[in-house]
Structure formats: structure tokens, C-alpha cells
């Protein structure tokens, strides 16, 4: 374990205040409905308590010396970043599927793929029971690469899912995303991303860890707890392995029992991947406009409307060119 000691003045953020918002996304597929109620029921109280804590800390006039400890504890084994084993037998390698959404209904648990296929799945764990019916949700789906072919669907917010698909399909976005900024910061500090692990599930929320090491010295290693949606986005951009805790893979994983092909005539309103993006204070947002164009292009490709997809691609290129010109004028 490594420690740093220095005078620091910063607002205090309590771990318990972070827990409520973390539950809404990066969660398992079995409790989406109850999580939504828990989140909205506690949001106002949480925001007020967090604001009060920040206001209280900002009135401090005295510098205090604090100690920051870097350690890894998400997997519950007490291992630290310095002694982690990249080939730990408790973890299995995985790959990211080009899945766009998941849903549960009368036909069972379905994963909609980017190429139009519908994968019908069942719980790998016999004790998993039947999932409640719920509408389509954006999701990141990991496939175990240990020969079992198990899938681990992680329900996420729409934006991380869109950005992940953009990274996997090499869709260029004019402005750097948060994940690109993190990648550049790691490079500037002389570190490199080693791997990402989905480590555990607490109630219905999954947790992940991002491992970094000093360039040229793999023994100098630190780790950070992240949401799986963020960690996986970074891993894809940095082209590093994504590992999943074996217990999670086998207890929460899904087995594919049927793989079909969507009809080309499937209406666009049937289980749309994307909904209208949030806009700050209702005003036009260039980022939202750009993602709308990306959304429409990808939707057309999914439904094999390639002529229309080419038109959206051209519109996207013109929009990005105008935006770049506006930036320098």
C-alpha cells in the first residue's frame, strides 16, 4: 500500500452519499424497477445533504494534513494494487458484444444485437428464477472467453452505451469524450492502463476496477474503483483486457438458447435503442445534435437501411465541419 501526505483543502464527500446514485446504472437485470423507485425516492434528500456538506467544508480557513491511501478492496479479498496478479484464477477474460439493448418479456430474456439478431437467454444459475418483465434498457454485454459462452448483461445509462458503440465501430466524435480525456491524462502522467476487472456486485449494483502501472515499471501499480460502464469504455479505447469475477459470471450469467434474425421490416418504434438525449435547460445543445446524428446513422445500419445510413453519415460530416469552423471564427 502506498501513501501520500500533503496539505489539502477540499470538500468532504461521504461514501454513503454516493451509493444511491450508483444503484441506478451498472446494475443486474433483476431489479431495474425497484431501483428506479429507490433512486427517485432518495434523490432530493441526497442532494440536500451533499450540498450541506460541501458548503460546510468550504468555510474552513485552516489547512489540514491528510493522508491518502491507495488500495484495492472491491473484490473482498484484501488484495492491493501492488500485488495483484494479472492471471488471477478467480477472474475470466471477456469480450464486449455489439449489443444495443436488453429486455425481459413473455418470450424470455432477450439481447438485441447491433446486427439485428435477437439472442434469447436463460439464467445459468438454476436458482436465478424468472426475471420480471421490463421494457428495453441500454446495456453493455460481456461474453466470457473461457469456453462457456456465458453472457453478463450490465444495464447502463444510454450515453455510455452510445459512446462504447461509437468506439467499437470507429465513429469519430468531434469533441473529446470523458473517456478520451482520462486516457490522455493517464498518458501524460507517465502511466498506462493494464486491465479492467468487474469485481463484485453489491445488492444490485456492479463494481469495477481500473488498474494502472507506471510505464516501464509494472510493479508500480495503482487501482481505482469505477462504474463498469466507465471502466469498460476506457478499456476498449486503451485496448486492454476486461476480466470478470468467475463467481459473478456463473451466478449472474446468461446462457444463449436461441439466436435468430430480425425481420428487415421490423418497425423502428419496436424497442428503440436510443431515446431523446437530455438537454440542459431546454436550450439547443451541439453535443446532443451530434449524438442525434450518430444515433440515426447507427439505427439505419442496424436495420440495414444502408442508403439512409449514408445520408446520415454525410449530414454528420457536414455538421462536424461547420462546428469546427464555428470554433475558429
UniProtKB/Swiss-Prot annotation:
EC number: 3.1.-.-
Top-level lineage group: Eukaryota
InterPro entries the record matches: BFN_sf, Bi_nuclease_dom, UVR_dom
Disulphide bond pairs: none
Chief location category: nucleus
EC category name: hydrolase
GO cellular component, one term: nucleus
Residue span(s) of domain UVR: 287-322
Pfam families noted in UniProt: BFN_dom, UVR
UniProt subcellular location: Nucleus
Family note: Belongs to the bifunctional nuclease family.
Protein name: Bifunctional nuclease 2
Origin species: Arabidopsis thaliana
Gene this protein is translated from: BBD2
